[in-house]
Amino acid sequence: MIAVLCGVFGLVIGSFLNVVIHRVPQKLSVVQPPSACPSCGNPIEPRDNIPVVSWLLLRGKCRHCSAPISVRYPLVELGTGLLFAAVAVRYDDDLVLPAYLVLTACLIAVSLIDLEHFIVPNRILQVACLLGVPLLVLAAADDGWSHLRSSAVGAVLGLGMLLAIHLVNPRGMGMGDVKLAGVLGLYLGFFGFGHVLLGLFLGFLLGSVLGLLLIGTGIRSRKDHIPFAPFLAAGAMLTLFVGTSFLDWYRG
């Protein structure tokens, strides 16, 4: 039941993330003004703001001017719902669940913004910290206060590792990625610094493999900038799902 509820909640959050993804790079408020069609300016009616369903009923077009509505909107909503449900299945009996739902939402927004605009907005990272810290404290009250120390160490570890890379190669590693690694360390470190190392390793592995494929196929050149935040996010999400099992297997 908790997975179903989180999945439905994720659909709603996904709808809000679409606003975040559109407005944050432009440094606009995510609260006001209400959402409107970018083509005709008519406000989006409540009946047209039902996640996924409204887009399907409208056949991907504005009710007023018939301008096309990007398929990204329902995909973000559906993807967020599915990920929320999956995280709930993995952590349904753990108080750390709310924190990891926050992390999931922030990673979706950061990844899509970085893919489109090549930036990792501080506003989203700040929200991840402001919501994550009290939620992790709440989880630690149930699981043990040592988890907070692990989270703090994880944040320093994630931040420090990528900061070192940035100092050596500033063009290859932006400060947005460095700060994102610190946030990931905060969350993943809750279960130990091994989870932080695994998450970063998977992020670098995925980034390297896809980067080589893009360059090898001629889609990108060595001079092109490839957003790294989506790979860090993917590595973190994989660690949320299989990190503990993998590390237990690795340690024998």
Q: Where in this protein do the model-derived segments appear?
A:
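Long, highly hydrophobic alpha-helical transmembrane signal-anchor segments
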Residues: M1-P25, Y100
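Hydrophobic alpha-helical transmembrane segments
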Residues: M1-V12, P74-G79, F84, A88, L97-L101, Q126-V127, V133-A140, ...
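Functional transmembrane core segments of multi-pass inner-membrane proteins
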Residues: C6, A109-S208, D248-G252
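Transmembrane alpha-helical segments of multi-pass membrane transport proteins and ion-pumping complexes
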Residues: L11, S15, V19, A85, ...
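Membrane-proximal soluble regions of multi-pass membrane proteins
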Residues: L17-R72
